[in-house]
């Protein structure tokens, strides 16, 4: 598989009541195909979030969208465009960051969390200098982070509830 220049294909998910902003790095191939967040069936994001809010795992895109907004959680990615090979964060180059100022100006975001190291590093390099808002690093829910069990991920992610 060759590296390809990719542009983020879908908008952020948030509304005027969003209090937590979760930033991934860049959508996986599967997410780009579905035009929605965390579309790879082995990504544990939706299982972790459902556990945190003591709810069934949302299945459809509409259920996922409603679930996040109902719980005042916004979703976006740190990267607006990049060169990437498949879904591999380690292959990301030529980064153009997203302007999260759009969300910060429209919603009372209390906490910004990055889902994984690639998102956190991009945030600190490109976005933090613009916003002055610190982000928290959370362990990646990606299947590539297999060392973390679902139980361990849920424990680490509980801090998003301390908004």
PLM regions and their residue ranges:
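Alpha-helix N-cap/helix-start and coil->helix boundary motif
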Residues: 43, 119-120
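C-terminal capping/extension of enzyme domains
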Residues: 1-19, 41, 88-101, 124-163
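Internal catalytic-core helix/loop-beta-alpha segment
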Residues: 70-119
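Short, hydrophobic/glycine-enriched beta-strand segments
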Residues: 19-25
């Amino acid at each position: 598989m060759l590296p390809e220049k990719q542009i983020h294909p879908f908008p952020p998910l948030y509304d005027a009541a969003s209090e937590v902003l979760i930033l991934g790095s860049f959508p996986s191939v599967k997410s780009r195909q579905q035009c929605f967040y965390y579309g790879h069936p082995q990504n544990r994001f939706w299982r972790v979030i459902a556990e945190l809010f003591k709810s069934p795992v949302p299945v459809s895109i509409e259920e996922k969208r409603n679930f996040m907004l109902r719980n005042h959680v916004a979703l976006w990615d740190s990267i607006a465009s990049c060169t990437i090979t498949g879904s591999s964060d380690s292959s990301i180059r030529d980064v153009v960051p997203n302007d999260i100022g759009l969300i910060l100006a429209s919603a009372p975001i209390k906490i910004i969390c990055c889902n994984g190291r690639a998102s956190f590093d991009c945030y600190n390099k490109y976005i933090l200098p613009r916003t002055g808002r610190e982000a928290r690093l959370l362990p990646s829910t990606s299947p590539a982070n297999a060392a973390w069990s679902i139980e361990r991920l849920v424990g680490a992610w509980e801090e998003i509830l301390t908004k």
